[in-house]
């Protein structure tokens, strides 16, 4: 059946390689293990040329059970909103069948992202329901590749923290930054610079 172009359908799915990187039955007990998964997703995304150098994962805390991952899919799926964090939020909420990861019947959820969130992803973090954000590379690391991370201010983080969302910075930063550098070396598209 041919679709009417005036009524497009948006279909978001993981790339084919995902299950070669992610063990959905594994628990990830430490921040370093959780961050290594987000970085591995980002790295594979670059190696397979399926998107930008950004990966994210959402876990139940404190069990470390993996709920969802996300990888930058902006170019692959022609959608400027499909950053790693946004995709992780979408997939996690679909998996738990809730518009918030903060619903009373759900355990606490945490976001691990290979790079500090941009303005869009940081804004979505507030409404996602995660209670903690842990990132690797910094916005300065991303800007060195000419990615425009948008208007993120110290007040942005203060706002999240006032609402009970803890922020942990620069976990495995060197490993995460290496993925950004690999993307540059491969001539990856800078789609928002």
Residue ranges and their predicted role:
Residues 1-45, 124, 128-193:
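Zinc-dependent deaminase
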Residues 47-51:
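Short loop/turn motifs at secondary-structure junctions and domain boundaries
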Residues 54-64:
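Short beta-strand scaffold segments in enzyme catalytic cores
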Residues 67-68:
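A structural microfeature
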Residues 73-87:
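A short, polar/charged loop-to-alpha-helix boundary motif
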Residues 83-101:
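Short, solvent-exposed cationic patches
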Residues 102-116:
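Immediate flanking context of iron-sulfur cluster ligation sites
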Residues 115, 119-122, 127:
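Conserved redox-active cysteine motifs that mediate thiol-disulfide chemistry
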């Amino acid at each position: 059946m041919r679709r009417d172009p005036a009524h497009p359908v948006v279909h978001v799915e993981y790339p084919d390689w995902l299950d070669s990187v992610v063990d959905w039955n594994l628990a990830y007990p430490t921040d370093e293990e959780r961050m290594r998964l987000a970085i591995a997703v980002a790295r594979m995304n670059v190696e397979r040329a399926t998107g930008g150098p950004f990966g994210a994962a959402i876990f139940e805390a404190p069990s470390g059970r993996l709920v969802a991952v996300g990888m930058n899919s902006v170019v692959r799926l022609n959608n400027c909103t499909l950053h790693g964090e946004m995709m992780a939020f979408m997939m996690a909420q679909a998996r738990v069948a809730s518009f918030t990861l903060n619903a009373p019947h759900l355990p606490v959820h945490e976001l691990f992202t290979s790079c500090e969130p941009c303005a869009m992803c940081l804004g979505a973090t507030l409404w996602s329901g995660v209670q903690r954000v842990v990132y690797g590379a910094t916005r300065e690391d991303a800007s060195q590749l000419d990615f425009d991370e948008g208007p993120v201010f110290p007040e942005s983080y203060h706002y999240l923290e006032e609402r009970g969302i803890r922020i942990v910075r620069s976990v495995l930063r060197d490993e995460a930054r290496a993925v950004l550098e690999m993307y540059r070396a491969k001539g990856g598209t800078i789609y928002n610079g």
